[in-house]
Amino acid sequence: CLQKEKRYKEAIEAYRKADVLKPDHVWTIRHLATCHRQLRDFATALEYYRKAEAMQPENRNLPFLIGSCLAEQERYEEALQCFFKLDFMENDCIKAWRAIGWCSFVSGKFEQAMRYYNKILALKPLSTDYLNAGHAALLLGNMEKAAELYGKATSESGNRETFLELFDKDKEMLIKLGVDEKDIPLIRDLA
């Protein structure tokens, strides 16, 4: 109830008390993990998710949740291993492909990122998939492909303003990965 009301700190205390009364119950551990993740305490959430995974190794949600906590901590190589595991566990798992694409991209593995974005674009792309594929194409030096993908991201997002908001959220990452800051206005105009 506390968790549903977004009172995560209080929920954590209640779950800890429950864990004392009935230790190592997977339901309690997963809820503790979720509350910590909601509070953006990814390190603690990760500990609980790993504990839950040890108890439920067949659970297909846990590799994604563990990978997400690792990615939030910028531990992209470890996160990639979790997402590859999920991709192995489930066939054509777009959720895993998106995570692999993004973690590959921010790790500078642009060709790998592009491979996964191409798989997504062939199935059920969102506007952000076109945007991220555009980023990968840009950093691979393929401006024509980047422009095409940014154009699709613009049309899929509904309007240019929405696209630019999404693009601007990634601006610092693009610069960090090697895009010249003075080229950003030109790149924004490609869409």
Can you annotate each of these PLM segments?
Residues N159-A191:
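Terminal, low-structured helical/coil segments at or just beyond the last alpha-helical repeat
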Residues A122, H135-T162, R188:
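TPR/TPR-like (Sel1-like) alpha-helical repeat modules
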